[in-house]
Amino acid sequence: MPHALPPLPYAYDALEPHIDALTMEIHHSKHHQTYVNNLNAALEGTPYAEQPVESLLRQLAGLPEKLRTPVVNNGGGHANHSLFWTVMSPQGGGRPDGDLGRAIDEQLGGFEAFKDAFTKAALTRFGSGWAWLSVTPQGSLLVESSGNQDSPLMNGNTPILGLDVWEHAYYLKYQNRRPEYIGAFYNVIDWREVARRYAQALA
């Protein structure tokens, strides 16, 4: 089965006032759908058409050269957004506890230090891109950023939290005020989902 746009786990207006309904609708139904359509078009008729997008990104070097750029741009866009929708919730916010909370304390210097590092990654990403909390192959937490639709999967890391800092993610509400958008994101992070992804990455 070709790649498909995943349904949002909440209504387009569910993250108001932090992320507005119109942005969510355009971002999901137009931008993400375009990545899915372009990925399917690029892979049509190839042995890779039904491979999970995460596998394609992890094995990029093994793909035919003509497929690599479409997979990075559109497969990355599909994978990144598919994660992004699920790590937000109208019941989000607060801070992580359990194993993830302890790991952030021990490896990243505590929750406030994590927020500082993650905010810096999002703020200093020039142009379009993402900020990430990832798990390395050694099982360590890493705050990183990537340009355009590049995914941490391409470097062997497993993203468990991502923030889209492309202008289409925030411009309708925040215009050029990226710092406000980043601050608002902390109010909708679903730390239970991030913790689930953390446990899965370590398994």
Curated annotation (Swiss-Prot):
PROSITE patterns: SOD_MN. GO terms for molecular function: manganese ion binding; superoxide dismutase activity. It catalyses: 2 superoxide + 2 H(+) = H2O2 + O2. Destroys superoxide anion radicals which are normally produced within the cells and which are toxic to biological systems. Partially complements double sodA-sodB deletions in E.coli. Belongs to the iron/manganese superoxide dismutase family. Keywords: Manganese, Metal-binding, Oxidoreductase. It comes from Pseudomonas aeruginosa (strain ATCC 15692 / DSM 22644 / CIP 104116 / JCM 14847 / LMG 12228 / 1C / PRS 101 / PAO1). Mn(2+) binds at residues 27, 81, 164, 168. Transmembrane segments: none annotated. Its cofactor is Mn(2+). Binds 1 Mn(2+) ion per subunit. GO terms for cellular component: cytoplasm. It is an enzyme of class 1 (oxidoreductase). Disulfide bonds: none annotated. This is Superoxide dismutase [Mn]. Homodimer. PANTHER family: 37S RIBOSOMAL PROTEIN S26, MITOCHONDRIAL, SMALL RIBOSOMAL SUBUNIT PROTEIN MS42. Induction: By growth in a high-phosphate succinate medium; more highly expressed in mucoid than non-mucoid cells in both Y and LTG mdia (at protein level). Part of the fumC-PA4469-sodA operon which is repressed by iron. Coiled coil: none annotated. GO terms for biological process: removal of superoxide radicals.
